[in-house]
Regions:
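Conserved active-site motif detector
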Residues: 1-105
Length: 105
């Protein structure tokens, strides 16, 4: 299976992105009660809580990263990921293969 990349967005509403570094482990958690987007996936960092969301708009996504809508059914309620690269336009992250619903060893 191909690697799944996504863009972490909205960090300016929480802690900013200056603390984010390549290789950092992050957690994804579905937020079905989100009043703006029923397929919202929040991004959390241990010890800090919510730091942003998986981008769901082509305007906030970097390159060929997947939207929250495309990832939503590929994961359970929670998933693991890592930061790949921090840019001025957003943070590129990679979903852990083991977090995929279809994952088998």
């Amino acid at each position: 299976m191909a690697k799944i990349y996504f863009t972490l967005t909205g960090t300016r509403h929480y802690y900013g992105s200056d603390f984010l570094k390549s290789g950092m482990k992050i957690q994804l958690e579905k937020e079905p009660d989100n009043k703006y987007d029923p397929e919202a996936i929040q991004v959390k960092l241990k010890g800090m809580g919510k730091i942003g969301y998986v981008a769901n708009s082509p305007y906030t996504m970097i390159g060929e990263s997947m939207s929250a809508r495309r990832i939503y059914d590929k994961i359970d309620d929670q998933a693991n990921a890592k930061v790949v690269m921090v840019t001025p336009n957003g943070t590129l992250c990679k979903l852990s293969k083991k977090s995929l619903v279809s994952y088998t060893e």
